[in-house]
Amino acid sequence: MKECVICGRPNSEEHHVIYRSECRALIKCKKNLVYLCADHHRGLYGPHGKCGKELNRKLKLEFQNWLEETFNKDFYSIEEIKGKLGISTNAVKSLSKLIRQKNSVFDREDIIIACMGGKRIL
């Protein structure tokens, strides 16, 4: 049973920090998923709620920080990206289409931006 990361309530819902519409390649990435109760997921102040920008930003910033810690070298191969994100071969190929390739490797910054749906949280 999964508990809400905000309040600890059981029977929580899966929430994609980076929405599927922002980066489909991360649909199955475990680090892109958090569990939120119905109130914190779809309620007024939840990421899908009318006033949920603050929580949405907080969750995205936490994910971005994880990406920065995880991708700590300058360049990565497609296999390294796949391993670090824990995603399928097809998903990493899809992600790689969003990133400029330099001599068969991908730049750390470009990987992070692609994983964040094209924009960094400042």
Can you describe what each PLM-predicted range is?
Residues M1-E13, C37-D39:
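Short cysteine-rich loop/turn motifs with clustered Cys
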Residues V92-L95:
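Helix-turn-helix DNA-binding helix
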Residues K97-L122:
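Short Lys/Arg-enriched helix C-cap and helix-to-coil transition segments
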Residues S21-N32, R42-L85:
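Polybasic, low-complexity binding patches
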Residues N11-A25:
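Short recognition patches in nucleic-acid-associated and regulatory proteins
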Residues C29-L36, K73, R100-V105:
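Short, exposed beta-strand "edge-strand" segments with a Pro/Gly-rich flavor and a Y/T-containing core
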